[in-house]
């Protein structure tokens, strides 16, 4: 596969167009952080309000990934991805034209739906690549697409300067200093963050239209397998139904945590908070009803699945936990890493940002590397275990980083830790498409949603540690203690999940097969020469 990867024909065309769709969705999703301080000046926001906007950016991604997974299984990735990219222009324009804090929050809440785009490509890539190559293909899709967040961080300010001549530019009053990567520092007094954010949404919408007319859901002659109903996840045993309901509960609880944070910054009053909690309880009950509707015949004894048609929901649950500790921790660490290096080593903001960017840069190699290792090592289970152990140990080592350490050693440790984190993400989604093919979208949606559960949970832990430290030290938190505790939480939870994987994760059936289950050579993806016209 690696030898043909740079081709733009057949399955490789689909792979490249799909990872770029994911890349654009992440550029749009993360177009706020580069302008955070500028927007704070423009609107007079405090740190709590900025933090709330950041949390809102990931909040609706949790239910969105579930819903997108259902729509994906029913309507196919081509239509679903195209419409999501076109939709991305809406929250971008709302945010870019905002005149109040509440409008900013609304824009970022709606933007969280765009973050669900990752799920769509998982199924698209799985349809075009056989099981033996799916880890590498999904790793390339995830790793290269994920780089959109780093690209946004490096380029949005440049776009804001280039577009300064357009209406809506913010004038600092005096030149502000900016530094991007290793380029020389530059000064500007005018930055058009509104035009830059609106522009990314428009670009995403245009690519959404191009994507629709350039790809297909499956290779020629291959059937797109759909579930009987997309209202809820199908399970194949009665005990798995109750397990499914239990694993759906944290998805609702984490949204309650967000509602609590919104109340703390006065976005919601007491009545609004109570209404939000009741609405979330209603959402969980509605989701439960839909799951019952889909699985009613099974639960009432009218239907039994043949052994070869069953899957174990416990395998989905384990993968959800792995994505909490790998992708969830990545999102949380990316948020705090610049401040960590700045405070620990007394660096300026620009230098700390450059060093912290090494964590995101690793995505280009690490996530595909995790998928490749999973494809080549002969056991997807033990690949997952080893990478998750490495991640846990890496975080525990990072908890001991202090200002007395050589900076180069700290940077190397950060990069090594990020390799295990992102390779574990690649390993997770090397398994996801192999659990139950016809509901791959819903499985990917649930697993992906748990990544956001992890991000919100870990960021909340960091916030609580900071507040506790501030309370114990007369109002000023001791960030060295806070950061050490935070990395210890990441490391310990990672090792716990690695232990669970070692005992409960099973090797997927047909992990390294030439064809998907139920396919033959005639219905599988044809050779690249035959696909060249597609």
From Swiss-Prot:
The chain crosses the membrane at residues 19-39, 52-72, 79-99, 109-129, 150-170, 195-215, 240-260, 266-286, 382-404, 409-431, 445-465, 485-505. Gene3D superfamilies: MFS general substrate transporter like domains. It comes from the Bacteria. Keywords: Cell inner membrane, Cell membrane, Membrane, Nitrate assimilation, Transmembrane, Transmembrane helix, Transport. It is a multi-pass membrane protein. Signal peptide: none annotated. Disruption phenotype: Mutant can still grow on nitrate, but it has a lower capacity for nitrate utilization, which limits the growth of the cells. Mutant cannot consume nitrite as rapidly as the wild type cells at pH 10. This is Nitrate/nitrite transporter NrtP. It comes from Picosynechococcus sp. (strain ATCC 27264 / PCC 7002 / PR-6).
């Amino acid at each position: 596969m690696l030898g043909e990867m740079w081709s733009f024909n057949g399955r490789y065309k689909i792979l490249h167009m799909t990872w770029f769709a994911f890349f654009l969705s992440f550029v749009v999703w993360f177009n706020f952080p580069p302008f955070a301080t500028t927007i704070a000046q423009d609107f007079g926001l405090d740190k709590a309000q900025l933090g709330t906007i950041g949390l809102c950016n990931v909040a609706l991604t949790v239910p969105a990934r579930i819903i997108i997974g259902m729509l994906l299984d029913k309507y196919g990735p081509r239509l679903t991805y195209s419409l999501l990219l076109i939709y991305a222009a809406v929250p971008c324009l709302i945010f870019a034209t905002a005149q109040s804090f509440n409008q900013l929050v609304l824009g970022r809440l709606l933007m969280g739906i765009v973050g669900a785009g990752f799920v769509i490509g998982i199924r698209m890539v799985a349809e075009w690549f056989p099981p033996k190559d799916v880890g590498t293909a999904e790793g390339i899709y995830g790793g290269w697409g994920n780089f959109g967040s780093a690209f946004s961080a490096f380029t949005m300010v440049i776009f804001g300067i280039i577009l300064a001549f357009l209406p809506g530019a913010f004038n600092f009053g005096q030149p502000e200093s900016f530094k991007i990567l290793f380029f020389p520092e530059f000064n500007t007094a005018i930055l058009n963050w509104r035009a830059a954010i609106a522009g990314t949404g428009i670009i995403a919408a245009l690519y959404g239209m191009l994507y629709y007319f350039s790809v297909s859901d499956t290779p020629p002659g291959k059937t797109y397998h759909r579930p009987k109903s997309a209202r809820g996840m199908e399970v194949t045993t009665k005990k798995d139904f109750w397990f499914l309901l239990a694993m759906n509960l944290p998805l609702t609880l984490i949204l309650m945590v967000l509602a609590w944070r919104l109340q703390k910054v006065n976005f919601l009053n007491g009545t609004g908070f109570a209404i939000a909690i009741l609405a979330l309880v209603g959402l969980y009950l509605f989701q439960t009803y839909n799951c019952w509707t889909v699985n009613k015949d099974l639960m009432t004894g009218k239907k039994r699945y043949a052994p070869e048609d069953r899957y174990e929901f416990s395998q989905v649950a384990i993968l959800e936990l792995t994505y909490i500790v790998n992708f969830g921790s990545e999102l949380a660490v990316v948020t705090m890493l610049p401040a960590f290096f700045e405070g620990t080593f007394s660096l300026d903001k620009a230098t700390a940002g450059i060093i912290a960017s090494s964590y995101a840069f690793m995505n280009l190699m690490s996530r595909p590397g995790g998928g490749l290792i999973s494809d080549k090592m002969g056991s997807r289970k033990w690949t997952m275990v080893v990478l998750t152990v490495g991640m846990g140990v890496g975080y525990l080592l990072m908890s001991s980083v202090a200002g007395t350490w050589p900076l180069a050693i700290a940077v190397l440790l950060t990069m090594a830790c990020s390799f295990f984190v992102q390779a574990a993400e690649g390993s997770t989604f090397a398994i996801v498409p192999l659990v139950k093919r016809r509901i791959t979208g819903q499985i990917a949606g649930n697993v992906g949603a748990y990544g956001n559960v992890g991000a919100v949970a870990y960021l909340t832990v960091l916030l609580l540690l900071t507040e506790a430290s501030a309370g114990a030290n007369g109002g000023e938190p001791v960030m060295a203690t806070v950061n050490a505790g935070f990395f210890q939480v990441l490391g310990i939870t990672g090792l716990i999940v690695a232990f669970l994987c070692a005992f409960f994760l099973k090797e997927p059936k047909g992990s390294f097969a030439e064809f998907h289950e139920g396919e033959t050579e005639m219905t599988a993806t044809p050779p690249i020469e035959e696909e060249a016209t597609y």
